[in-house]
Amino acid sequence: MMKMCRYALITALAIFLAGCAGLREQPAPVEEAKPQPQQPAQPQPTVPTVPAVPSVPAQPGPIEHQDQQSGQPAPRVRHYDWNGAVQPLVGQMLQASGVNAGSILLVDSVNNRTNGSLNAGEATTALRSALAGNGKFTLVSAQQLAVAKQQLGLSPQDSLGSRSKAMGIARNVGAQYVLYSNATGNVNAPELKMQLMLVQTGEIIWSGKGAVQQQ
């Protein structure tokens, strides 16, 4: 009786183990893969490229001028012996023939025709001083000449600049003669040229020239 029970127990255990082995050998269920719908790729928005800004070159600063007074020598001021130049020329003119004593003479300002700058006003002053008190001509006063120049739109210091203007003013002030003078040549050694003209005809009665020395 005991043997039968042992046999039955062994048989039952063998069946149980065989069942467990069968359960282990069964494959796991395979799930069918379902295709997923593909989403269309979203286009990436294009980002506009910003052009590179060119670099601005550094602007030069304001140009600073050096003080000309301290950095450069002052221009040379020339002084001339106008009295020494006009005295002999006036003496020659007063000895000229064909000049009626007591005639009215217009002395035009000396014109600067040199290649540089000079004070022609000093030459005019020296010329009028040399003629002052002569016994042959009566000079048109500086006031009369200034008024006549203003009528032409000129300042009293302006030279008439041409023989035709000098003759026109001489007629306006009632002068019979005009003394027309130029400083010419090199400004370092100018030459003074003078012409005495008859207003009525424009004839040159006398002419002369002389060197002007620097002082």
Curated annotation (Swiss-Prot):
Leader sequence residues: 1-19
A GO CC term assigned to this protein in UniProt: periplasmic side of cell outer membrane
Lipidated residue numbers (S-diacylglycerol cysteine): C20
Localization, UniProt: Cell outer membrane
InterPro entries registered for this protein in UniProt: LpoB
Comp. bias (Pro residues): 37-48
Region (Disordered): 28-78
Membrane topology field: Lipid-anchor
A GO biological-process term: peptidoglycan biosynthetic process
Keywords assigned: Cell outer membrane, Cell shape, Lipoprotein, Membrane, Palmitate, Peptidoglycan synthesis, Signal
Biased composition (Low complexity): 49-58
Keyword Amino-acid biosynthesis (UniProt): no
Residue positions bearing lipid (N-palmitoyl cysteine): C20
Molecular functions (GO terms): enzyme regulator activity
Subunit structure: Interacts with PBP1b.
Family from the record: Belongs to the LpoB family.
Function noted in UniProt: Regulator of peptidoglycan synthesis that is essential for the function of penicillin-binding protein 1B (PBP1b).
UniProt protein name: Penicillin-binding protein activator LpoB
Gene that encodes it: lpoB
